[in-house]
Amino acid sequence: MSKFTSRELRARRHRRLRGQLSGTPERPRLNVFRSGLNIYAQVIDDLAGHTLVSASTIDTELRGSLGEQRKLEQAHSVGKAVAERARAAGITKVVFDRGGYKYHGRVKAVAEGAREGGLEF
């Protein structure tokens, strides 16, 4: 039996990744967080410590269009939305931060949606 829960292991992976990843004003960090029900994506400038743009499944703008979509499809829509907002803010290149999650499922769907929306990783 493992000494750590899966949540603790994810947090450890995320801390390890954050030591290697850093968002700059020229190439900010696209961070993904997923809960059991929702998914969140933020574009962050780590040097200034500011969130530049964000999108999530709880946004009022997206909530109506998500409707009866499955969580995987919702994640794809969130990726597209964050990419559109980033491009409107003049951001075209980002560093992808998977947040310690496996690059699979909803995290992968956010990344693919962001790529479709025009962001370069």
Curated annotation (Swiss-Prot):
GO CC annotation terms, alphabetical: cytosolic large ribosomal subunit
Entry superkingdom: Bacteria
Protein name, UniProt field: Large ribosomal subunit protein uL18
Coiled coil: none
Family matches, as Gene3D superfamilies: 3.30.420.100
Family affiliation: Belongs to the universal ribosomal protein uL18 family.
Function of the molecule: This is one of the proteins that bind and probably mediate the attachment of the 5S RNA into the large ribosomal subunit, where it forms part of the central protuberance.
Molecular function GO terms recorded: 5S rRNA binding; structural constituent of ribosome
GO biological process: translation
Keyword annotations: Ribonucleoprotein, Ribosomal protein, RNA-binding, rRNA-binding
Subunit structure: Part of the 50S ribosomal subunit; part of the 5S rRNA/L5/L18/L25 subcomplex. Contacts the 5S and 23S rRNAs.
Classification via Pfam families: Ribosomal_L18p
